[in-house]
Amino acid sequence: QLLIGGQWRDASSGETFDVENPATGATIATLSSANSDDAVAALDAACAVQDEWARTTPRERADILRRAFELVHERADEFATLMTLEMGKPFAESQGEVTYGAEYLRWFSEEATRDYGRYSPVPEGTLRMVTRRKPVGPCLLITPWNFPLAMATRKVAPAVAAGCTMVLKPAKLTPLTAQYFAQTMLDA
């Protein structure tokens, strides 16, 4: 299924595709195949809650990311198994990616609270300029097939920390890891 607006749902067309284990050719899952209508629905959902999400405090966003970091570690074997099945990466390498990917969540959980901006002198030296950090709005995040968790965390974590909503489009070859990560973020 597709995660749109915090809810799992089938693709609007009802179409599906198979995810295959590259080592055996066996189908390991059948997933909903999103089309342009689903993409628009996902963007509309992200836009609809952007202002509300941007008003969450940096501490709230940091706590979500920290909890996600903890959950990824708790679910490390499940993540590694999914990656190995859907992309053929050796299990030990998949475990390494889980550890690596989780670190983005931890790092951005700490950075989220450093959202205070800064004062800088203007060139004339008589005034000071204030630089504030603000969410830029919904982000489109596209991930490659070869690092399905690490690249998802690398893109999702800064968006969450900054107060941006997002649409994540995983690679069609490795969507299971992204789905499991999306559920993990919901659980956080």
Please give the residue ranges for each predicted region:
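Glycine-rich loop-to-alpha-helix module at the N-terminal edge of alpha/beta enzyme cores
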Residues: A26-Y116, T126
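Alpha-helix N-cap/helix-start motif
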Residues: S12, A39, A76, S94, ...
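Terminal low-complexity tails and localization/encapsulation signals of metabolic enzymes
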Residues: Q1-T30, D63, R67, T99, ...
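Rossmann-like NAD(P) dinucleotide-binding subdomain of oxidoreductase/dehydrogenase enzymes
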Residues: G117-A188
